[in-house]
Every structure is written in structure tokens, then in C-alpha cells.
Amino acid sequence: MNQSEMMAKIERGDGFIAALDQSGGSTPKALKGYGIEEGAWSNDEEMFDLIHQMRSRIITSPCFANGKVLGAILFERTMDGTVDGKPTPQALIDRGIVPFIKIDKGLEDDDNGVQLMKPIPGLDELLERAKSLGVFGTKERSVINAANASGIAVCVAQQFQLARQVLAAGLVPIVEPEVNIRSADRAESDDLLLTSILEELDEMPDGQRVMLKLSIPAEPGKFQPLIDHPKVLRVVALSGGFSREEACRELARNPGMIASFSRALLSDLRAQQSDSEFDSTLGQAIDEIYSASTAKVLA
């Protein structure tokens, strides 16, 4: 796939984006969920080798390349690794899957109801390396814990400032200001977030487009103005702590929004499964998430 083919697939394709981007802090939890306890490694290198083996197993599973997975978000070390003897982004492209990379370095402590992104040292070099490896876009996450208008405005402004840097590097940013689905004022946060994003989009030059990765809104259809916006390439949903069943049910009530799930995609996979068991389990998850992304129901 060339750049224009990847753009068309992400903009119009039926399917969803797999999030395979657990980073250093969340890797032990991801491995434990996969059936590998902390005693199985003695240093970070061994830990990252284990998580790369898991991701390689996912990427090389026949069902992962069945056309239902449009793209995959990678952790930096996964991007720099190999799958089937090829750089991971190329292995994805060979399977018809568009590669993205997570670029944020974690979250600051809560302030004004939001957790901003920590500084990202060496970002220009990372973006240049990603571009050279065939990566299409980036993903960067911050979190909204309370319906604080000024906090949310600052959070979204930081996201779009970073998005401009990504666009300047020739990549497509996935802007991810996640609303905490457990917060008491989630619906109000959705409203404030929508307003702030629309204001930032209005400031963007014509011809530039971003993607948005958002929590599934408390009110179905709330983010339709973003889905329809000419400066938005695609709106994808995070699972945000929902089970796969819950996340799929909620997502199916939001036309135009597709999944970008991590835990809800991978939760039933185990290192101890045979290849046939692993492929069957992953295939079932892919089918369910694909259906919720493409076959919508009336709210």
C-alpha cells in the first residue's frame, strides 16, 4: 500500500483499528492478562521480548489479515522490531494493515480534572524514523477525569499542538483526549470535549485532517458533528475499561464510529493456547468488534 491507498483505507474502509501499543508501564499487566506472570522475566529486555512475541503472534495470525483490521497502533519498540524477518510496520503493510505508532510518554498527575501528556523528548527524530519505516500516523493520549471546562480546553489544546507537529512531519495524528467512563459527570465532559475539539478544528488550515480517538459517548450519536467534519479523517472509539461485550454494545449505537480497542480485543488470548485455539479466540474477538464497527443499531 502506498500513502494514498492507506489514506483511503483509513477514511472509508469497513473495519477497525487494533491497539497493540501497551508501553513500559502497562506491559506487566498486559503480559499477566496473557497468562505470563512477572517471574517469567528478570529484566526489561526480557519483558519486552515477551510482549513482542505476543504481538508477533497476533500480527501473524491468519485472522488478523482477513480484511477486518484496517490499522494497528504500535509501541515504539514494536515498531523498531521485526515480524517474519521484516520491520513490523512493513509486516503490517504486507497484510493490508495500516501502521500507527504511539508517541506519548505517559500522563502528568491530575490537575483541573485532566491529566495532560508528559513532555516527549526526541519527538522529531521519532517521527522521522517512523516515517522512514512506512508508518502512516501517530497516537497520543491524555485523560479527562472531570467536567472542568478550563481543564478540558487546555487538554485539547495540548493535543492539537502536538497534532500540528505530527502533521508537519508528514504523518496523520490520532488525537486521543480520553474521557474517564467511570467519572460521575461523564456526559457533561463529553459536551465540553465536543465544544473544545470543534473550536480547535476551526483553527486548523483547510486541507489538514486529524483522526480522533474518543471514549464512547454517554449519549449515542453525541460525536456525529466530529464524524461529519471535513477536517476529521475518522473517529475511532477506545474501550476504556468496558468489557468487549459492553464496548461492542455501546459502539454499535454510534453510527460512523469504529473501534480502536486494546483490552477488549486481546482479553481472551493466552500464551498457553495452541495456535488453533489462539487463532479461533482472536478471530471471534475480531468478528465481534468488526460487527460493532460496521453494523449499527438504532439507539
Sequence positions of predicted segments:
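Alpha/beta catalytic barrel-like cores
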Residues: 1-136, 144-146, 196-214, 218-299
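Eukaryote-skewed repeat-based solenoidal scaffolds used as protein-protein interaction platforms
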Residues: 138-212
